[in-house]
Swiss-Prot record:
Cofactor comment text: Binds 1 [4Fe-4S] cluster per subunit.
Organism: Methylococcus capsulatus (strain ATCC 33009 / NCIMB 11132 / Bath)
Name this protein carries in UniProt: 3-isopropylmalate dehydratase large subunit
GO biological process: L-leucine biosynthetic process
Enzyme nomenclature, EC number: 4.2.1.33
Subunit details: Heterodimer of LeuC and LeuD.
Reaction catalysis annotation: (2R,3S)-3-isopropylmalate = (2S)-2-isopropylmalate
Coiled-coil regions listed in the entry: none
Cofactor(s) for this UniProt protein: [4Fe-4S] cluster
Keywords: 4Fe-4S, Amino-acid biosynthesis, Branched-chain amino acid biosynthesis, Iron, Iron-sulfur, Leucine biosynthesis, Lyase, Metal-binding
Length: 470
């Protein structure tokens, strides 16, 4: 019998019951909650006369609707304000720990979970949010769920799920200087497509993955969902353990030692068999820029906008044509010739301290281009913001004409005051470039923090590996 994959191990450890049709009841170790997908779930509990099964397994934070500027004035939009106030009330009523808007620990849910050590190896972790896959960077099985499932987890601490297939994405070799985890995962999505991981859980492995920091691994797993995968995983190693030790929710003392011993087995066995294997040479990856309205519509920064006429598949060709029309781009346009109106550095993909340091390194000593209307820097949490300010990064950005904001989801999605106007083009470190994602009629190009920072300085995309560091 062949060995087990990391996904097999995590799944098997959490199966409570198997039905005749193969569906499984699995136990959930950690439930992360935010203000958008939880109100109906809590109301369902009240109507049924239920209470959360394990209060301590839940951690809540408001992030999607919170303002990132003038926070002391409160939330102007009444719908956004109601969602945040409802979360506050629900957490108070049911005794759930919440990092409120005025708490320094508040931030984007997929930033604060790992930051607090609430995300731990071997766990099953769910949240009513697509990018819950982020937490798989810690050797945890993490995936997004719907509102009805949020209620189910609150009430029972279990979920009915079907096991996905196993995919291995092995990235061998080392990334070139200036090429980041964001470029790596965009290149993967460009290779396999947004449906390439459908029905699979993807384990990311290889020298390039092992060489990433935890911040980088979180970026990769964050965007596994954009490849269609149910979840993304990275095996536990010393990098994982070094990141987690001493964090508030992590075990300590003898419990830490016991946990580390258990976590050391959280890797795929050498003889494990995967249903699908994708091999990528890290040296072939260059800084990436999306040109269309799907993360798979991506090319290296030194390339040109592709021509739909060269695409044999009629469905893909039509998709490309529609994307070019929406993005107002012509085939053959050099990526470096695309000018941007706004720049957004933030989101659960790229708003951690390492991301801000990378952007600040590019910005230092330069000014935002006059043609760029706005360059937003939004830390992923209050603690990230505080650390960045202790390092003087806020001054670097402010002196360059960037805006330094409070933590939140911000311009990743048009659900708060930070959004694009119709026709505006944005270099964004977020994870989705769908039509209208950052605002009605807004045009999004996904890039790394360093690439976004360089675009803000130059007013257009530049290759930061070819002397384009402003």
């Amino acid at each position: 019998m062949s060995g087990k994959t990391l996904y097999d191990k995590l799944w098997d450890d959490h199966v409570v019951h198997v039905d005749a049709d193969g569906s499984c009841l699995i136990y959930i170790d950690r439930h992360l909650i935010h203000e958008v997908t939880s109100p109906q779930a809590f109301e369902g509990l009240r109507m049924a006369g239920r209470v959360p099964w394990r209060v301590d397994a839940n951690l809540a934070v408001a992030d999607h609707n919170v303002p990132t500027a003038d926070r002391d004035r409160g939330i102007a939009d009444p719908v956004s304000r109601l969602q945040v106030e409802t979360l506050d009330k629900n957490c108070a009523d049911f005794g759930i720990t919440e990092f409120a808007m005025d708490d320094v620990r508040q931030g984007i849910v997929h930033v604060i979970g790992p930051e607090q050590g609430a995300t731990l190896p071997g766990m099953t972790i769910v949240c009513g949010d697509s990018h819950t896959s982020t937490h798989g960077a810690f050797g945890a099985l993490a995936f997004g769920i719907g509102t009805s499932e949020v209620e189910h987890v609150l009430a029972t601490q279990c979920l009915v799920q079907r096991k996905a297939k196993n995919m291995l994405v092995r990235v061998q070799g080392k990334l070139a200087p200036g090429v980041t985890a964001k470029d790596l995962v965009l290149a993967v999505i460009g290779r396999i497509g947004t449906a390439g991981g459908t029905g699979y859980t993807i384990e990311f492995a290889g020298e390039a993955i092992r060489g990433l920091s935890m911040e980088g691994r979180m970026t990769v797993c964050n965007m596994a969902i954009e490849a269609g995968a149910r979840a993304g995983l990275v095996a536990v190693d010393e990098v994982t353990l070094d990141y987690l030790e001493g964090r508030p929710f992590a075990p300590a003392g003898a419990l830490w030692e016991r946990a580390v011993e258990a976590w050391k087995d959280l890797h795929s066995d050498p003889d494990a068999v995967f249903d699908k294997v994708v091999e990528i040479d890290a040296a072939s990856i260059k800084p990436q820029v999306t040109w269309g309205t799907s993360p798979e519509q991506v090319v290296p920064v030194d390339a040109e906008v592709p021509d739909p006429a060269t695409e044999a598949d009629p469905v893909r060709r039509e998709s490309m044509e529609r994307a070019l029309q929406y993005m107002d781009l012509l085939p053959g346009t050099p990526i470096g010739a695309i000018r941007v109106d706004r720049v957004f550095i933030g989101s659960c993909t790229n708003a951690r301290i390492e991301d801000l340091r990378a952007a600040a390194e590019v910005v230092r000593g330069h000014k935002r281009a006059a043609s760029v209307k706005q360059a937003l820097v939004v830390p992923g949490s209050g603690l990230v913001k505080r650390q960045a300010e202790q390092e003087g990064l806020d001054k670097v950005f402010l002196e360059a004409g960037f805006e330094w904001r409070d933590p939140g989801c911000s311009m990743c999605l048009a659900m708060n005051a930070d959004r694009l106007e119709p026709g505006e083009r944005c270099a964004s470190t977020s994870n989705r470039n769908f039509e209208g994602r950052q605002g009605y009629g807004g045009r999004t190009h996904l890039v790394s923090p360093a690439m976004a920072a360089a675009a803000a300085i130059h007013g257009h995309f530049v290759d930061i590996t070819e002397g384009g560091r402003a």
